[in-house]
């Protein structure tokens, strides 16, 4: 379910255990204007399985860099990634838009075998499809632990910012990538630090999305171990030197990506076998595009050409701010988060809002009842007063003495 759109500038923040990416963006129609971008290392032990820990430490690090780069937006959008976040494609009856949420919430336990008291459910409408002769609505339903969302709201409070919405990386990627590709059956691979999002599109509509727990960190760790480097130095080495071989051949650095490639292949096979459609185009996006030899290795192992996404449509740069266009593809999650986000809201706020609405309804009802009661009392009273006044007037007329000359003038 899309969130209500916040107007004006937004700060869009993406956090993982390696880095924090921050953008200042203004959304205008289909286009977004990027004012500022900055990436900083994530403080140690501040991000655990998608939950923000040591909020004050993290907020201080973000505040320092935002002040340094003169960010001035008051609203913040987050796009979260967590191994505890689950998604599922779901078909529901073709109901009215305002009925979808209740239907999803009522059937949530069928979608996800977890304790729903501890999770927040949201959805994205993908398309209408025909299923067994009936028109249905295809949704992407997402479930995230409440504590994950609460931790982001806590961070916003520590930053002194108002939460515009909380999206998740899968939806953020979907929203921006459907603007970048054609109608062909397309594979979009987004490799991030802790995992990889695998998307399959057809006619610019998401058909399948899977998250696999193998990301760039596995490759970086292999380089750290082989060359005795720290994380940042290993990352730089991967960007400057071609350490990856073109095929899996036993080299320990290259072999670190075998599980990732194997899982991508599984997702492709699953889609093709169920739909009898082949992948026509494949795209690579995210941090992996800057790693030398990465696209070549995947292309060879998946047996298809892979195109690196290096420029983004519908994204404009603020002419007054210095932002390199070439760097924007590393902020795709930040940028996608402001297009058409879902809105994960803590249950306490939803319940509080419901209570306020109920209280408002009760007050309106009570005031209405008082008005009706008053009218029921006042109307008869007014009628009685008016009747008494009329009777009084008639009595006065009956007492008026008409002089004899006057009487004669009327009857003569």
Language-model features: where?
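Hydrophobic/aromatic-enriched cytosolic interaction surfaces used to assemble or bind macromolecules
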Residues: 1-398
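Residue-level detector of conserved catalytic or cofactor/ligand-binding positions
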Residues: 397-411
């Amino acid at each position: 379910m899309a969130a209500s759109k916040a107007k004006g500038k937004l700060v869009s923040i993406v956090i993982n255990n390696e880095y924090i990416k921050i953008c200042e963006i203004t959304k205008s129609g289909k286009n977004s204007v990027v004012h500022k971008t900055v990436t900083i290392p994530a403080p140690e032990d501040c991000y655990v399985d998608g939950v923000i820990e040591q909020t004050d430490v993290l907020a201080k690090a973000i505040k320092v860099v935002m002040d340094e780069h003169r960010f001035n937006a008051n609203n913040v959008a987050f796009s979260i990634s967590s191994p505890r976040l689950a998604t599922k494609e779901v078909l529901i009856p073709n109901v009215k838009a305002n009925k979808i949420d209740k239907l999803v919430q009522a059937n949530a336990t069928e979608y996800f075998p977890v304790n729903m008291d501890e999770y927040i459910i949201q959805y994205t409408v993908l398309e209408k499809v025909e299923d067994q002769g009936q028109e249905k609505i295809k949704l992407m339903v997402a479930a995230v632990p409440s504590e994950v969302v609460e931790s982001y709201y806590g961070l916003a409070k520590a930053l002194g910012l108002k939460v515009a919405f909380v999206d998740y990386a899968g939806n953020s990627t979907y929203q921006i990538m459907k603007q970048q590709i054609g109608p062909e059956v397309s594979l979009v691979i987004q490799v991030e630090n802790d995992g990889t999002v695998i998307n399959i599109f057809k006619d610019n509509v998401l058909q399948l999305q899977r998250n696999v727990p193998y990301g760039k960190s596995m490759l970086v760790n292999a380089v750290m171990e082989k060359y005795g480097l720290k994380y940042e130095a290993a990352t730089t080495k991967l960007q400057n030197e071609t350490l990856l071989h073109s095929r899996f051949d036993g080299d320990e650095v290259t072999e670190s990506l075998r599980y990732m490639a194997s899982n991508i292949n599984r997702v492709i096979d699953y889609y093709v076998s169920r739909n009898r459609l082949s992948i026509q185009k494949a795209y690579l996006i995210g941090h992996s595009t800057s790693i030398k030899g990465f696209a070549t290795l995947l292309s060879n192992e998946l047996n298809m050409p892979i195109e690196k996404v290096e420029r983004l449509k519908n994204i404009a740069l603020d002419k007054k701010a210095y932002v390199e266009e070439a760097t924007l593809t590393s902020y795709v999650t930040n940028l996608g988060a402001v297009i058409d986000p879902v809105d994960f809201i803590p249950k306490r706020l939803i319940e509080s809002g419901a209570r306020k609405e109920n209280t408002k309804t009760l007050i309106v009802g009570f005031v209405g009842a008082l008005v009706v009661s008053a009218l029921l009392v006042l109307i008869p009273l007014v009628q009685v007063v008016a009747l008494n006044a009329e009777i009084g007037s008639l009595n006065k007329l009956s007492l008026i003495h008409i002089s004899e000359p006057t009487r004669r003038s009327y009857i003569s």
